[in-house]
């Protein structure tokens, strides 16, 4: 399977991290890496489709009630407030609803425009 993970941090300076991780046969890794890169480039060139973004937003929003009863969620939000002095919960729903394909496209363009790409391929010991 494939998974992706992204973070945005302000400390010690503004930075973004986007990871795409997958398990595969080492011989297939170059092809999958190129597919991941071309997928990101497509987002930078075209943005996500309205349908894709709508489904993603729906998924983010449906998790809000469950998150609000989780101690782990609130522990994370308190940590963010302590570290950054910002409330990342109150306007979360509004921010998600205001996401547009154009905003996502601009964000991805900004990340890819940095040309800061590191590729790791781990292979089993022979």
Regions found by a protein language model. Name each.
Residues 101-110:
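Low-complexity, intrinsically disordered Gly/Pro/Thr-rich segments
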Residues 1-45, 50-98, 116-125:
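M16 family metallopeptidases and their MPP-like homologs
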């Amino acid at each position: 399977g494939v998974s992706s993970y992204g973070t945005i941090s302000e400390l010690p300076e503004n930075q973004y991290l986007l990871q795409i991780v997958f398990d595969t046969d080492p011989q297939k890794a170059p092809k999958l890496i190129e597919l991941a890169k071309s997928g990101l480039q497509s987002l930078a060139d075209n943005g996500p489709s309205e349908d894709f973004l709508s489904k993603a937003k729906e998924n983010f929003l449906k998790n809000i009630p469950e998150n609000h009863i989780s101690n782990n969620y609130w522990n994370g939000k308190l940590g963010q407030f302590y570290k950054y002095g910002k409330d990342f919960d109150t306007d979360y729903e509004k921010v998600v609803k205001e996401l547009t394909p154009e905003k996502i496209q601009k964000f991805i363009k900004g990340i890819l425009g940095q040309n800061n790409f590191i590729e790791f391929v781990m292979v089993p010991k022979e």
